[in-house]
Every structure is written in structure tokens, then in C-alpha cells.
């Protein structure tokens, strides 16, 4: 039952997305986003588990975008997945988060499992239409695996387990106690209906209310040897999962900013009068409001250019698989940290300042413009952006990368 630790050329991803691939999945994501936009505010207020939304993602084909074609998936690229996340975030930040985490939980198959075992995992996720959640929050105490015949027993608890409330499976990391894998951290996959696995309905936060990010408790949960993906190591290619998730966050914040701008523009154009001291005939013709929107639009466009460039770079580095070096991994991680910084600050600023051009009436609960701010403000606290600035500054000054972690 020993888990191999040798470096493996694990990822099946190659090259960059074609124009045809990007065009197709943009259209799919846009259609899903339009459907979500119809009642995003109403669903947010109900704060129910997003089972219908998960089914919408499943029926659209988005869940299998990154699954290699030879195993029944779409054979898409991360650049395409990042764009899909961004487009969904225009309309519904919660469901964009659900999709983003699904992608990087599901592709744990490629990052952790030996190459010869990946095909069976890919085929199972396609056959069963799995939405993948997770239970890996590193801030909480480490989950523990104790050895028993043909497997393990899992105990502990994790908060902020995104997708666990609606996903069919979750990816979990835990420390092994005893046996030949003693001291190793293993990544494994559990069905969410496993005996002893309790989904705690405690996700009631300011924003991202439909991200199904509840807590999970484990009481002597059986983990079969066949459910183990592999060991969590510091192999450069396997640790690219975390910068990839951080880049998904950057696209997510950008998408929320773009959604807030679009909604703000709509509201401003609908204001037929003007401020009594203005010489403009309408609010939209007032240069003060034009200046504000121009500034926010320019900042958003700059973030877009950066994350699009990094999406392509991420695909190219992933394609190198086991040949990825620690230096290449560090360089891309820092570049993504830069994007995380500017996307966080731009997302929060846009979602906040959009009210300056839409006026008091836009704070009405019927309008729901606050949904953008609540969502980006909540998720942007995932990991402190100041530490991303330190990460970038340290690398810029001394060429020193941060230690590998579930945040860096």
C-alpha cells in the first residue's frame, strides 16, 4: 500500500487553446451566465445549496472541459477554463467559485495520481458527471489518516470546504499516522455520502453565499486504498496546482469587476436627469461620471490583459509536465501573485466605487448592486493580499521564492 514518490510526467495537457476552442466555450459560458443572471440576487437571498446551479454546469458540459478527450472529456485548456470562470463571475460569483474549485479539484487527478492510474479516474468523473468539491483548508488542524487493513480511517474537521455541499466527491488531504506511509500527506477522493462524513450546514457569510463552502467533519471515515490519488509533494509540476488556483481567483475577481461595470453602466444610462449643479443634460453626459468610469474601465482592462497572458503561460508550463523546474515554477507563481494583487484591488475598488456613478437609488435592495461588492470582498479575504506583495517584493529583490504551501 506504499505510495510512490518518484517524479512523474503526470499532466496530460499540451499546448495552447485554439481559437475554435476558446470561441466555443466562451459561447457556452455566456449562455450559462445569462441564465444565472436572471435570478442571481433572488438565489443569493434564499441562501440554499446550489443543486440546480450545479446541474446547470453539468448539462452545459463545463464540468468536463479539462478532461482529456481520450477519456471522454472536452480536451480543453486552462486558458479556456479561466475565461469560463471569468464569464460566470460577471453574473454570479458564487457559481463561478464553484466551477473554479471544481477544475482544480478535478485536475488533482493529473497533479497527484501516477500516469497509469489517471485514465480510470478521468473516465469515472465523466461517466458519473461528478462535480468535485474539496476539504483542504490549511489553516485548520491537519486531518489524520490511521492505517487499517486495505486502507485508512480518517478523522478531523475542515471549514471552508467549497463545493462539498453539492459535489458528488471531494478531494481531501490528510497526514498518515503509522505504516509504511507514516508522515506523508496523501491526496484522496471521497464520495460525499460516505458513512461518518458529515456535511455541516454552516456557510452563512456576507458574500459567495451559494458556493457551498460549508464545513465537513470526519468521524472514523473509511478511506480505501483505491481512493488514494497520491502523495502531496513539492515536485514542481504537481505544486503548479496552487498558482493555477490563484490565477483562477484573479479571473474570478476580474469577472466580478466587469459585471459590476456593466451593471453600473446600465443603471447610469437609465438615469434621465442630472445633478442640479451640473451643466450636463444627463448623468451619463456628466464628465465627472465619465471620468470615474473611464478610470475603473482602464484598470479592469489592464488586469484583463495580464490574466489572459498568464493563462496562456500557465498552459505552456503545465505541458512540460515532469520537466518543469523549480525556477520555472517560482517565476510563474510570482507572476500570478502580481495578477492576484492587482485583480484583488481592482475588483474591490470597482465593486465599491461603482456606487459613485449610480447614486443613492442603486443601493435599493431591489437593485442588488451590492452583490458584486459582497462577493468580491468576501472571497478576496481568502489569503491576505499583503503577503502576495511580500512574495513579489522578495522575489524581485533577492530572487527568493516563498516556501511551497497551499497558498503559494
What are the functions of these language-model segments?
Residues 205-301:
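Glycine-rich beta->alpha junctions and the first turn(s) of the following alpha-helix
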